[in-house]
Every structure is written in C-alpha cells, then in structure tokens.
Amino acid sequence: MELRNKKISLDDFMSERFHVLKTWHTGKDVENFEDGVKYQQTIPESKNFARALFEADCNGITLSQPRAGVALIEEHIELLKTLQKDCDLLPTTIDAYTRLNRYEEAAVGIQKSIEAGTSKLNGLPVVNHGVKACRRITESLSKPLQIRHGTPDARLLAEIAMASGFTSYEGGGISYNIPYAKRVTLEKSIRDWQYCDRLIGVYEEHGIRINREPFGPLTGTLIPPFVSHAVAIIEGLLALEQGVKSVTVGYGQVGNIVQDIAAIQSLRELAHEYFRANGYENYELSTVFHQWMGGFPEDESRAFAVISWGAAVAGMAGATKVITKSPHEAYGIPTAEANGQGLRASNQMLNMVRDQKFPPCVEVDREVALIKREVRAVMDKVLELGQGDIAIGTVRAFEAGVLDVPFAPATCNSGKMMPIRDNHGAIRVFDPGSVPLPKDVLTLHHDFIAERAKEEGRIPSFQMIIDDINAVSHSKLIGRP
C-alpha cells in the first residue's frame, strides 16, 4: 500500500490484520477483536493511562514512571508490584529480540531464564507470552500500564498488548526506527506504525481510550529541542489521523534549565498549533520529560544528583509525567531496589517543587521563540517536500537531510548535523548539515558556540562534541578541557 497520511479504512485494516496475526502463533489468541474490546471494558478507570494523564494535566501535577521489564511473567509482576508503591504509572519494557521481531530467539531467552532462575532478557517478551499470560500482569497491579519498547514493526506486539489490558503504547515510525534500527526504511516503519495507530483508533471507536506516546529523546545524545519537537509533532499528526485521541509528546532533558523549561513549554504550544492547524480538535494532549538519557556517573551519590535535577526541572516545567532513572544507570539494568530509589528521589523532588513553577523570564521567552522558529522552518520544508502530506514529506525530508537526528544508526538518516553545548550548557548547532534553519538563527548558534570557544581558549571542533557527550558521566554538564 502506498504511503500517505490518510486514515486506513476498516476493511483494509482488517485485511492487513489477518496477515499480522499470523506472524507468530500467539496471534491466534487475538483473532476475535471484540474479545479485546470486552476485556478493555473491564479495566477500571483508575487503571486507564489516558485518564491518569488527563487528570494530572488538569491538576498541574507531574506523575512519575520508571522503566522496567524482565523475561518471565511472575517475576515481572513481582518487579512491578515493588515499583508501584513508589510510582504513579507503570511500564512494561520489551526485550531486544521482540523489538526486532525475532520471536524464536526470545523463546530461547525465556527458556534460559527459567533454567537460570533469573532474567536472561532485557525486557518482557510479550508476543511470546501471549494474551492469557499478559492479562495476569494487568490484573495483578493497581496502576495504569504502558508498553515501552523500541520496535520498528510493532503491529503484533500492539495487538497482543491492547488485548491484554495495557492502556498506553509508546513509539512511532520515526522515533522507533531512526534511533533503534539500521536498515529499516522509513516507508515501512511509518506504514507499520499507522497500523498501530489505527488499531488504537478502532479501540477508540469502541469507547476505549488508549494513550499514544511518541519517543521523545531519540538517540538521547545532545539532541537539539527542535529536532525532537519536529519528530514528536509529526508522529502526533500521524496518530491523530488514524483516530488516536490521547497523545503524549516527549522530550529528553539536556541539562540546561532555561532550555529544558523552554522546550517543554514550546513543545506543548507547538503541538497544539500544528494539530489544530491540520483540523484536529477533539484530542487530549500531555507531555513527558525524560530524565537525562546520556551517560551517568558511576558513583551513586552523583547519580542521585542527576536524577533529582531531572525531577526538579520536570516539575518546574509543568510536564505531565517524568520518566525516572536509577542510581545504577551507569552499570546497566537496575535492581528493583535501585529503580525504587530513583523513583523515591524523584518523588521527593517533585513534591518539593509542586508549588514552585519556574517563573516567567526573558531568557526562557527567548529560548521558546528560538525553538519555535527552528521547528517551523523544518516543518514548513517537510510539508513542502510532501506537497502537504506529512508522511510523504517525512520520508523525503530524511532523504534530503532536512530532518536529521544526531548519532543515529539508521542508514536513512543523514547524520551530518552536529550538536554541541554553548557556554551555558544549552544544545546548539555546530554543523547544520542540510537542515534548513534560517541564516540569522545559524548566526545565533555560531555566536553562542564562539562565546564558549573564547572561554575555553580552543577552536570549536569534534573533540569538543565528544567532551560534551562524556561530560555528565564525569560529573559536569559542559565538556570543558
């Protein structure tokens, strides 16, 4: 089917669904779509993710959510029961094999986990476990549950997850391709994610509201806000076209408080601007702030400082939720206790700043205005390349380098745009590649970088970028020599 941003007809969706469900044997358990609808109708409102976000947004509260997932059902339930004591929203992180649709290898990982008595996978293989087993998860917990993964083709995973009672689904055809895959075409990943969004749209038509969350941080490595904003807005538009009504747009912390506050503010405003300009009115919008996604200090005390700083900024920025980290981040997958420690530190900070929203100031206003100019310049070109079709325009924009995600593995990503920190730690553009930023905006970025270069007594270079990538793990924000 030719790629375009048009709602998939129910007949075409059901025809494609027939083939999707045959890609692994557990697909047969969701053949009766009405069974999934009836099961979702039994989920209490208190466990609906979209409802929790809507209420938090209305009340100006920032919710907390960790990342977590292990190979076996009972162990996963035990892990989440431990975490739900300290969080508002629960995750289920999916293993790496499932993300690549390598279900045979996921099955081997399950067996090895059983034999070893500990998880040998870095997440829960939902497709392999199937609906019946996964419903035990949603029935055993009291908080709303979201699937978090990194899957370019997440169609079967979405089918099983929704029929199992999960009420939020993270990802998108760009954000779960460009940072995660190497040789998956954007045409395929965007089209496959249109299926996921249409699935959620069909649930919506049956009165079941399921939240969709594009993955904001992308590669998590010095991402300028305008880059992640553009991707989030595009994926939001694609989701809304397929009938999704609850959208959470995300952003990964960069560490400079002014830029981070401005990013959350501008993200919400720009999303509304583009959604409404494209004719979408009846939707619920929320935001998610991801605590620092780059390298962490090995020392736990320093790691707690990074975590707490992220929580404080998320709260003061007015994000609807914050995705937390753990003090074991530098070492890999955290224990349940370490994950809980990160949550408790975050919650303490969220509670302390709850009544302390960041005050209006000229610096934030200037940064908001700059981000908006950058996003509009990119989005205008994307729409121009697609002749008004955002799906086609996105593919062509990546081909032309108009959309370019720093440090991404995907071959369909140019990788020519290079970011760098300025003298205050904000992310600026060192080399724009083919990204069509206005000349005066590029001059502004050049001047920001020149100020830092003068301070450090060195010429801006790729070495400075490397220093910035490693800086937080070395207990600073800017990669000073």
Curated annotation (Swiss-Prot):
One Pfam match: Met_asp_mut_E
Chain sites annotated for binding adenosylcob(III)alamin: G69, N122, P179, F296, K325, E329, I333
Matching Gene3D superfamilies: 3.90.970.10, Methylmalonyl-CoA mutase (3.20.20.240)
Alphabetical list of SUPFAM superfamilies matching this protein: Cobalamin (vitamin B12)-dependent enzymes (SSF51703)
InterPro entries: Cbl-dep_enz_cat, Glu_mut_E, Glu_mut_E_C_dom_sf
CDD domains xrefs: Glm_e
Alphabetized UniProt keyword annotations: Cobalamin, Cobalt, Isomerase
Pathway(s) where this gene product acts: Amino-acid degradation; L-glutamate degradation via mesaconate pathway; acetate and pyruvate from L-glutamate: step 1/4
Swiss-Prot/TrEMBL GO biological process terms: anaerobic glutamate catabolic process; glutamate catabolic process via L-citramalate
E.C. numbers: 5.4.99.1
Cofactor (UniProt): adenosylcob(III)alamin
Catalytic activity: (2S,3S)-3-methyl-L-aspartate = L-glutamate
Similarity comment text for this entry: Belongs to the methylaspartate mutase GlmE subunit family.
Quaternary state and interactors: Heterotetramer composed of 2 epsilon subunits (GlmE) and 2 sigma subunits (GlmS). GlmE exists as a homodimer and GlmS as a monomer.
NCBIfam families tied to this protein: MthylAspMut_E (TIGR01503)
Protein's recorded name: Glutamate mutase epsilon subunit
